[in-house]
Amino acid sequence: MLVKNAENRGQLEFVSLENMVPQDHLLRKIDAAIDFKKIYEFVEDLYCEDNGRPSVDPVVLFKIVLIQHIYGIPSLRRTLEEVSMNLAYRWFIGYPLNEAVPHFSTVSYNFKHRFNHATVEYVFRWVLKAAAEEGYLDTEAIFVDGTHIKASANLKKQAKKAVPKQAKRYAKELFAEVNRDREEHGKKPFSDDSDKNPPQEKQTKETVVSTTDPESGVFHKGEHKKCFAYEAHTACDKHNFVLGVYVTPGNVHDSVAFDPLYDEVCRNYPEHKTVVADSAYKTPWICKRIFGSGRVLSTCYTRPKTKENGHPWWMYVYDEYFDDVICPEYRALHYSTTNREGYREYKSRAYLCKSCPTRGICTESSRCEKTVMRHIWQDYVEMAEHVRYMPVYKELYRLRKEKIERVFADAKEKHGMRYTQYRGLAQVTNWVKLKFAAMNLKKLATWKWNGRHPAPGGGKRSRLRENAPDISLLFPPVFLFSNRKPALA
C-alpha cells in the first residue's frame, strides 16, 4: 500500500540531544575513552587569565579538529558546516541545537597562531600515553617507512634555485672513522682545512622550487609520476599505533630523515628491540646505528648495483685476514686507499689484468685496473643480510605490509591524508601530527569500548589477540662471519 508522508517541517518538538545520538556511536566511544579536560593543562599558558574578551573553549576547538581528521573532511569550512547540522557532532562538542557553532576562521586562526608545535606534540603524546596505560602498545618491534602527501602547489609554477647543501648528520663520526682507518693502513689522514672556504658550487646545489609553496619538494615515483609533495616519515608499533612522525619536503630520501625520527622513537620508547624497514633504510650508517645500539634491523633483499653482463658481485670475495679482495680469477686486489665517503678501495695489478681472459666482463678501465670498494661499516650491512634469513625476522618483515603500510592506507583512504591544503612545513607537520593523533584515539576508543562491552554470546569483538604467539627476541642474535666475505663490485 502506498503511503505518502505529510510534510511537517515547521513542527515544534522537544527533543533531547543525548537521546538522539546512538549509544555505540564512535564519538561516544571517544568521549568515554579519555578526559578532554587534560587539554586545558596544555594551553593554559597561551591564554590571559584576567584580561581580554572571552575565548572559544580550547577543548571545543580541538574536538572540532579531531572530527575533521577522524572523518576525513577536507577543510575546516566544510567541517564547521557539518558540525552545525550533525547531531552527533554537536553532542560531541557540547553545543545545543539553538547555539551557533564557532566560525571556521576562529578555529583556523587559533591553530595557526595560538597553538604551536609543542601544543600539538602534547596532544599527540597524551593519546599515546593513554593507550600505553591501557596496555595496548607493543613497542618490542617498530615499523618505519615514509609516505608522500601531495602539496597544495602546481607543478607548472616552479623556479630553479640554488639552495645550500645539507651536511650529513654522521659526517663528523664518519670523518673520524675514515682518518682512523687511513692511519691503520699507513696513510696520511685527511685534513679538513681545505673545507673552511670551499668554492660556491660545493656549498650549494640547484633544485626545483615551487613558487606557491617553497618548502615542499619535487617527489618522483616511477618514470611518469611527479608532483610537489611532503613526506611523512612514520614509525608504528605491532598494533598500528603511530609512535612518531617526522615531516620533510618530498625530495628528502627516507634514509636522510631516519635519524630525527629514530631519535624521537628512542627517546620515548627505548625498550624496542627490532626495527623493521624496507631497503631504503639499508645503508651503512643506519645499520651501524641500530646494530651498534644492541638492536636488530629487519629488512629485505636489495639487488646489487653492479655492471650488466659482468661478473656477479658474490664472485668478488673479501679476505678479512689479508685485507684483500679475491677476484673471480683468484687474483688478489690489494688495499689502495680510503676515500672521504668511507669506502676502502682495492685495486688490481695492471700487468695481471692485461692477460686476464675475463677482462672484458670485469673492467673497462683503459689502465687495465679493476677497483672494488668496500665501506668501513660494511660489517653492519652484512649483519642485516644474515638477519634476513632468520625465521623470526622473516615473519616480522612479512608483517610490514599489515602494519605501517596499513597505517598509510587508512590515513589516505579514510582520513584524508592524500592531499594537504596547508602550506609550509610547520603547518603541514602539525596537520599530520593531529591526523595521526586522531587515528590513535579512534583505535584506543574502539578497543577500550569493545573491552567494556563484549559482543553478545561471549564472542570477541576486540582486535587484540591476547593469545597470539609472541615473536619477541628470546636470546640475542649471534652473527658468524667467515674469513672470506663478499665485497661490493
PLM ranges: what are they?
Residues 1-28:
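Hydrophobic alpha-helical membrane-insertion signals
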Residues 18-21, 53, 224:
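Short secondary-structure boundary/capping segments within folded domains
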